[in-house]
């Protein structure tokens, strides 16, 4: 706890006041103070930066660097790794880009890859990146969008726009980003619905029901349209438009984005139930007719849709309330719960996809924290802070970051899970940024006022007696910023 001296901008006599003056007029001031003084946030941030500094693979259970994971901790990696190492990671995915523009799911040291296993991944090799072997999980449609989003984060945080002109195998990064998005329009776009497609999975998951492993499209695949893939595309287009040097790209993709947003609302949003439908099936459903899939509420896809600007504030509030209700019904710990209700036993041939197992109802901070991002960005600060806290507490309890959790809070999957570390850091930073800027004024603007209290003082300094009617505006002080006391 910090103990900072009182600072006054105008000399004058005053009595001790409470830390925020009349906090009853603005409850958000209490939330602001709690965020700024929360030691758990600082602890988790330090832990997250430490584990990301130890590598770029997804976690200790994975040998690969996955693009959908790296997309969620690249900003933390930029804090703790040399710039060249971050660039090389991004570049590696472009080295393995297919002729049609597709992006691989992940890559690993070629010496550790079993290239000849007929039951394993179908590896892709690159003459310009021979030290690695890459592969693509074909049931999911978020690799291209994840890479575009990751490059966007790198450029925005580093301000290194010149990176977009880096040439990889004869094409610039900017050109390759455009081709990655175009691949989705050429190979995954369904003209009837005006949306992109993929295999049947559980929300944002990458396991299809029709195979014991379930990571590759085959003759048994049931093709679908879902909210997660399409919301990720809307986000990626927004990102690409913002940083593209060639303005023709912006004009081209803006019209595509508008059509996608219209068609998402038209075909995937159930206005009566106030939720996204799980799937639009293009060649039948893999699930029995006795199972009403439309009762399933997808938490992760809904969170990404919020980030993509697809829901109104009223709909966001309803979605958050629905998630909290689902958490209670599932006896889970956080809104990282992937869905409720789950798919019944036997719905997936992969034995790990039992009810409340893995992506079928597991509790994933990796997506729950993205809902925190969306709440914060849309002004639901109190809700975001309260719903983030159990995620932070769980990390401390387990002394580390984990891939997912059972409803009872048991850690499962990969340990040292960098995706969880990354999304929590962004959630923390988003709330801190709000708190630091909420009603903040410059020292110049505050001239003529006085500072009575600094955040971080002991309670004895914060709970004085008596009333004081100041002649000038009164401010609170915290780490170089001033805030009106009432």
Regions found by a protein language model. Name each.
Residues 76, 85-89, 105-106, 462-469:
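Short, solvent-exposed loop/turn and secondary-structure capping segments
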Residues 441-486:
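Cell-envelope and extracellular/periplasmic
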Residues 54-62, 70, 111, 115-146, ...:
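The feature captures the catalytic groove of carbohydrate-active enzymes
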Residues 69-100, 301-313, 369-391:
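Alpha-helical support elements that line or immediately flank enzyme active sites
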Residues 1-8:
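Bacterial N-terminal signal peptides that target proteins for export
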Residues 8-18:
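Bacterial N-terminal signal peptides
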Residues 25-48, 65-66, 103-106, 189-198, ...:
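Catalytic cores of carbohydrate-active enzymes
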Residues 20-63, 161-185, 244-245, 251-252, ...:
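Acidic/polar, glycine-enriched structural segments that form the non-catalytic walls/loops
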